Amino acid sequence: MMAKVVGLIGEDESDTDVLGTIIRKASPTRRFKFKTFHGHGKGKIIGKCNQWAKNLRDRECTALVLAQDLDEESYAKVVNELKNALEPSTIANYCIVIPVRMIEAWILSDAEAIKTALNLPSTPNDIPNPESLMDPKSKLRDLIYTLSQKRRRYMLTKDNGRIAAHLRIE
């Protein structure tokens, strides 16, 4: 079976790593190949996503995932900005993904994945609604530092992908 080539546009490499891992976990019988662009912030994604979509189409992508953290914006505003910036999309099969606050909230939803991926001595307490946290990235950083008995520092560029590999998709 040939791999489905999917374009991923996100804020940074750790976001596209997490998205690619989640896509693979959600569809374990399919093979995927990912091609990416990173905006390093919202402004660049808005300004470049249409051009990047064309580039990804030219690189044989048949599907596109465009991701932007909600941060403190309104959902409707972010969706409209991304749709207006992307359309007309040169890749017809696309979706816009907007993590509430930031993608680290998704990671915080699975305490066992955090423990396993980072080899922590204990499992963090469950966080009932991680998307309600104002700064999930800081919470994750503090949690890892504390649970590692102050031996490990959180590095989102490496740790997010490691944790995503252990996330339970239900």
Model-based region annotation:
Residues M1-V5, T16-T36, G43-A63, Q68-E170:
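C-terminal accessory helical subdomains adjacent to catalytic cores in phosphodiester-
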Residues E11-D12:
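Helix N-cap/beta->alpha junction signal
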